[in-house]
Amino acid sequence: MHVLVTGSSGLIGTALVKKLSVDGHQVTRLVRRTPRPGEARWNPDDGSIETSALRDLDAVVHLSGAGIADHRWTDEYKRTLLDSRQRSTDLIATTIAGLDKKPDVLVSGSAIGFYGACGDEELDESSPAGSGFLADVCVTWEAATAPAEAAGIRVAHIRTGIVLSEHGGALGKQLPLFKFGLGGKMGSGKQWQSWISLDDEVGAILHVLAGNLSGPVNLTAPTPVRQSEFADALGHALHRPTVLPIPGFGPKLLLGGELVDNVLLTGQRVLPAALLADGYVFAQPTLASALTHLLG
């Protein structure tokens, strides 16, 4: 396959490009800087894209977007979170819809924040959108693929959970504290964490590319856990105690109340119903297996 990838320098994109290349696929990466071989230039802010490099595409994986937890949620950064997703997705969808030879599939990023805060309710792809800023962002983000769908391109919205990797993401940020024995449950610890290993994130994307799934696809492991369980499992994997709870006000001082309330102290109990029904087999279906694989 010839696969176009945006967000290729991020945690997921880097791993995906590596796997696609190892498997013998041709990969073109969209970048904002001066392109190197195997890359093409784009700028969603001004709507420019190097269409000459997009000929004969079989698939597009669109992962671009500002990091949800990279900054305090000021009004300006919240606008950046929304605009970086809406503009880039609209540009990708509109561009590939206008190609003479259209790709067969667009796999477009989304997040389980789509479902909002739902307590202990089990959520799958049939569950409705929730309320709140992240849910609103996800709804707008997914709607921006409409031009590609109208052009007859198969579109899958991958609603990704907490991606586990020792090299970054939520786990990477927590590891230093836990390695020093300073980790513990966050807030009440009762909030659900719907996680997925980086290996399965990439594996699930490849499964969607090769198959026939369309519409929303939850990219989470089939065994979500409460945050306190996650903390205990991580401490066990590292052979460190997890007796020090992290009160909510600590992260709020560093990251701001809205981000912490919406991301760290609120969770979703999400199940990958579409993937399981389509026959995807998880490499690391349990948290223990994922942490053992990652941390030894």
Which residues fall in each region the model found?
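N-terminal Rossmann NAD(P)H-binding glycine-rich loop of SDR-like oxidoreductase domains
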Residues: 3-23
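Mid/C-terminal beta-alpha module of Rossmann-like enzyme folds, strongest
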Residues: 204, 211-258, 292-295
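C-terminal amphipathic/interface module of NAD(P)-dependent oxidoreductases
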Residues: 262-296
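NAD(P)H-binding glycine-rich loop region in Rossmannoid oxidoreductase-like domains
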Residues: 35, 39-91
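Alpha-helical substrate-binding/gating segment
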Residues: 175-183, 191-224
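Conserved beta-loop-beta element that borders a ligand/cofactor-binding pocket
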Residues: 110, 143-166
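Conserved Rossmann-fold NAD(P)-dependent oxidoreductase catalytic core, especially the SDR/UDP-sugar
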Residues: 90-132
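Glycine/proline-rich active-site loop of Rossmann-fold NAD(P)-dependent oxidoreductases
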Residues: 139, 151-153, 164-173, 207-217
